[in-house]
């Protein structure tokens, strides 16, 4: 007898004229963790699949000699493949880090390749509207962590480009990867009133909704694990959620099997806050690599020119090499970013099973 199939019975996620039946965005994870396989599978289930463009072409022929060219090629290739996998369902987009040296090129490539949405963080995407152009159908969203950052970006876009965000991703302190909080704040995550911040941001964006006569959906991210978390976010007034870490332990995730197993085997005490060459704190799994960089600066034999502001002579390690080593399977000597709830992940699943589980739990 076939298992019961669950359908999302709540409101869909509407971003302008675009619509995703299930208001779940799969967060972008780089290097190489969320590419076409994962993003396409999430969209196929009615959600929003997000491809990370950070060194996306790491496994393309000629990458060592021409990273920029291989990354542009891979953006096109993976967006096209994700759309094929999705079979017309959901939405497909990209996550592009502001800190990237070739940020502008990645944005333009994603637009040309037909990305439905661009989500941009690791810095505030001040000039994103200019890069996508006025007539572009691709929807854009900044990642923010505070009311202050939200006010700044919305005011900037309004003043300089006479437009506003198509949606906003609010990322909390329990997220993985790079975090928009200080080291001091991250020492006591419980002291941060994130719910209050979300409500303030929702109130803040209403003036821009009125001015531009359009809705600006709000997506809550960071530590979203199950249906209880999704329900809570929606009750706060959010229009959807972004989930990343839970999708790592799926068969469709683009990472190596060793990377997925590192998540499954992780315990709460294995997770720590680190300093990234990007200039922001990050959350990652403790391993031999992190222990080494605490003691001394790692020699950088090759610069990949991946970050806009990076001095190889001063940074403690090469983030590109560390992330590529990890995604390929060397999880002891690479950098494994993760969310605060990774210790709750204990088994492998599929995107379909996970989405079904989340939908069923949210409906309870």
Task: Report residues per predicted region.
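Residue-level detector of intrinsically disordered, flexible termini
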Residues: 1-2, 325
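Active-site entrance/lid segments in N-terminal catalytic domains of soluble metabolic enzymes
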Residues: 2-208
């Amino acid at each position: 007898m076939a298992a019961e199939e669950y359908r999302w019975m709540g409101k869909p996620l509407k971003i302008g004229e675009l619509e995703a039946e299930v208001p779940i965005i799969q967060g972008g994870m780089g290097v190489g963790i969320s590419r076409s396989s994962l993003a396409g599978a999430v969209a196929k289930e009615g959600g929003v699949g997000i491809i990370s463009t950070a060194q996306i072409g790491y496994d393309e022929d000629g990458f060592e000699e021409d990273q920029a060219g291989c990354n542009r090629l891979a953006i096109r290739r993976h967006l096209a493949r994700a759309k094929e996998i999705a079979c017309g369902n959901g939405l497909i987009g990209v996550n592009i880090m502001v800190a990237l040296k070739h940020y502008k090129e990645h944005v333009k490539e994603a637009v040309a390749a037909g990305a439905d949405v661009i989500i941009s963080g690791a810095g505030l995407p001040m000039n994103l509207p200019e890069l996508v152009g006025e007539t572009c159908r691709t929807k854009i969203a900044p990642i923010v962590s505070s009311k202050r950052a939200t006010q700044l970006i919305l005011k900037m876009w309004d003043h300089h480009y006479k437009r506003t965000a198509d949606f906003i991703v609010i990322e909390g302190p329990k997220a993985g990867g790079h975090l928009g909080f200080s080291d001091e704040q991250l020492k006591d995550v419980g002291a941060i009133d994130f719910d209050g911040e979300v409500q303030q941001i929702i109130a803040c964006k209403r003036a821009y909704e009125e001015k531009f006569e359009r809705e600006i959906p709000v997506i809550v991210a960071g530590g979203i694990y199950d249906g209880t978390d999704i329900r809570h976010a929606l009750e706060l007034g959010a229009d959807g959620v972004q989930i990343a870490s839970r999708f790592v332990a799926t068969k469709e995730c683009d990472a190596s099997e060793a990377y997925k197993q590192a998540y499954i085997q992780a315990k709460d005490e294995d997770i720590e806050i680190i300093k990234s060459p990007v200039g922001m704190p990050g959350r990652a799994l403790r391993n031999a690599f992190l222990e080494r960089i605490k003691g001394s600066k790692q020699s950088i034999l090759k610069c990949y020119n991946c970050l806009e502001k990076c001095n190889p002579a001063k940074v403690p390690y090469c983030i590109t090499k560390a992330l590529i080593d990890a995604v390929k399977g060397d999880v002891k000597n690479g950098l494994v970013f993760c969310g605060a709830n990774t210790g709750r992940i204990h088994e492998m699943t599929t995107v379909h099973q996970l989405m079904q589980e989340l939908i069923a739990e949210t409906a309870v």
